[in-house]
């Protein structure tokens, strides 16, 4: 696959700062297991390269990245609450069995 360039991405994104922010957030998502939106024909591509490819291909935008980030954050918070609730129930069960 051809190399991806900043210029390719700047045709999609207004400025370099926004591009860096989008690419870094998306690369982090990809590294954490969010599936890519384009086929990874070169399995050696790192998350940063995949993020830039998605941006250049117009498969992702900042709104989508923010929505994915929000969903991941909400999922993590929900899991933390479930773990905390399970610990409370376990503690209550332990204190009842001690009586």
From Swiss-Prot:
Reaction it catalyzes: RNA(n) + a ribonucleoside 5'-triphosphate = RNA(n+1) + diphosphate
Enzyme Commission number(s) of this protein: 2.7.7.6
UniProt entry keywords in alphabetical sequence: DNA-directed RNA polymerase, Nucleotidyltransferase, Transcription, Transferase
Source superkingdom: Bacteria
Molecular-function GO terms, alphabetical: DNA binding; DNA-directed RNA polymerase activity
Gene3D superfamilies, A to Z: 3.90.940.10
Any one annotated GO CC term: DNA-directed RNA polymerase complex
Top-level class of the enzyme under EC nomenclature: transferase
Annotated InterPro entries: DNA-dir_RNA_pol_omega, Pol_omega/Rpo6/RPB6, RPB6/omega-like_sf
One GO process term, biological-process aspect: DNA-templated transcription
Similarity comment: Belongs to the RNA polymerase subunit omega family.
Function: Promotes RNA polymerase assembly. Latches the N- and C-terminal regions of the beta' subunit thereby facilitating its interaction with the beta and alpha subunits.
Xref: HAMAP family: RNApol_bact_RpoZ (MF_00366)
Classification via PANTHER family: DNA-DIRECTED RNA POLYMERASE SUBUNIT OMEGA (PTHR34476:SF1)
Assembly mode: The RNAP catalytic core consists of 2 alpha, 1 beta, 1 beta' and 1 omega subunit. When a sigma factor is associated with the core the holoenzyme is formed, which can initiate transcription.
Name of the molecule in the record: DNA-directed RNA polymerase subunit omega
Phylogenetic placement of the source organism: Bacteria, Pseudomonadati, Pseudomonadota, Gammaproteobacteria, Lysobacterales
